[in-house]
A protein has these predicted regions:
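Bacterial N-terminal signal peptides that target proteins for export
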Residues: 1-8
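N-terminal leader/targeting pre-sequences
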Residues: 23-152
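C-terminal segment of classical bacterial N-terminal signal peptides
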Residues: 15-22
Length: 152
């Protein structure tokens, strides 16, 4: 019985040692942002998932999803970056990130992955910025609200 207890304690201790490595960014955690249609653009649901792994190969991973949008349409995803302006009240830098194509039901998904070098090239680390995502195509546009993103 004591062998089983010792083995169980070792497994729990090993798992606890692994968990901190999976926590990702200490300043900005993953965020799920709803997309809303601009005007009368069709949309059942949609979102942007902004994930900050903060690693050397994957600094950030964004997932874009449309459900019930225009069918068979190609959309461009653009990140509107408001440098050092977490309220998105000033001028934005438009950063195209991905292309998303919907199927016959108007559903589509795309991803963008940013490494540290890409983020450093923009000179935006160690600050808080406002970001709005837009997805546009076929005369329809979908947008998120402004969110403050702190990059370390």
């Amino acid at each position: 019985m004591s062998f089983r207890l010792a083995l169980a304690a070792a497994v729990v201790a090993g798992a606890a040692a692994i968990v901190p490595a999976a926590l990702g960014d200490a300043l900005y955690h993953s965020e799920h942002l709803a997309l809303t249609p601009v005007g009368d653009a069709p949309l059942r649901s949609g979102f942007v998932e902004n994930i900050h792994a903060n690693g050397p190969n994957v600094y950030a991973h964004e997932v874009y999803v449309l459900n019930g949008a225009l069918p068979n349409t190609t959309y461009g995803v653009t990140l509107l970056l408001h440098p050092n302006d977490p309220t998105c009240s000033g001028a934005a830098l438009a950063v195209p990130t991905a292309t998303l194509t919907t199927g016959v039901s108007g559903n589509g998904r795309a991803d963008a992955v940013f490494d540290v070098g890409t983020v450093d090239a923009f000179g935006i680390r160690h600050a808080t910025h406002g970001i709005v995502w837009t997805i546009s195509g076929g005369g329809s546009t979908y947008t998120t609200t402004c969110t403050a993103v702190t990059l370390d």
